[in-house]
Amino acid sequence: MATWAQLNFQDAASPMMEQLHYFHDHTMMVLVIITIMVAYIMGTMFFNKDVNRYLLDGQKIETEWTIVPVFVLVIIAMPSLRLLYLLDEVNEPSITLKTIGHQWYWSYEYSDFKHIEFDSYMIPYNEMEESGLRLLEVDNRTTLPMQTQVRILITAADVLHSWTVPSLGIKVDATPGRLNQTSFFINRPGIFFGQCSEICGANHSFMPIMIESVNIKSFINWIQNMSEA
C-alpha cells in the first residue's frame, strides 16, 4: 500500500494495474516532451529580436500544427481505448464475490458457496491493535485466492457508494437497484486496502476495504471454517 510521502502509485497486485502503470508512464513521457518543446519555442520567441512586419499567414505551419496534435492524440488514445476494453472484459471467472454497500459498511457474499456472507465494519481507533492501520482495519477481511480469476458483483442498499482497491486497479460504482460487475486477477499474496470513493454521507471516510490474498489451499480451509461457523 502507499506509504508516507509516496508520490507514485501503489505497488500493482494485478495485471490490469500493471498495464495502468505503463499507460501512465507512456502518457507522462508524451506530456513531458510536449512541455519541453513548447517551453523551448516560447523561450526562443521571447528572446528573439527579429521582426517580420509582412507575415500575414503561413499555410504550411498551420497545416503542421493541425496534423501534429492529431498524431499526438492518436498516440495517447490507442492504448487508452485498449485499456478501457480490457477493464470491461470478464474472463471466465472461477469465483464470484458479491459486494453490497451500506451506510457505512460493506457486506460480502460468496455466491459459489453455501451460507458464506458477512458484514465488514471498520475497527475504531480505540479498539485497534498497535500494529493496525488507522481507518483501514476491518473486523472481517475479504479473503480471496491469488492466481485466480475473480468476478465481483457490486450494488448498494441505500445511496451511491464506490468499491475501490487501488493496488488491484479497481473502482466500480455501487448503485442502488443496479448490479455492476468487473473482474480481476490477484497475482501475489498480501493484504490490499481500499476505501469507498463516492461521498455517501457523514461516515463516508469510515468504509475501508481490506482484501487478503492467499493461496488456494488456505482459501479452501478458510471457506470450510466459514461454512462450519
UniProtKB/Swiss-Prot annotation:
Residues annotated to bind Mg(2+): E198
Designated name of the protein: Cytochrome c oxidase subunit 2
NCBIfam families linked to this entry: CoxB
EC number annotated for this UniProt entry: 7.1.1.9
Keywords: Copper, Electron transport, Magnesium, Membrane, Metal-binding, Mitochondrion, Mitochondrion inner membrane, Respiratory chain, Translocase, Transmembrane, Transmembrane helix, Transport
Record-stated family: Belongs to the cytochrome c oxidase subunit 2 family.
Cofactor: Cu cation
GO biological process: ATP synthesis coupled electron transport
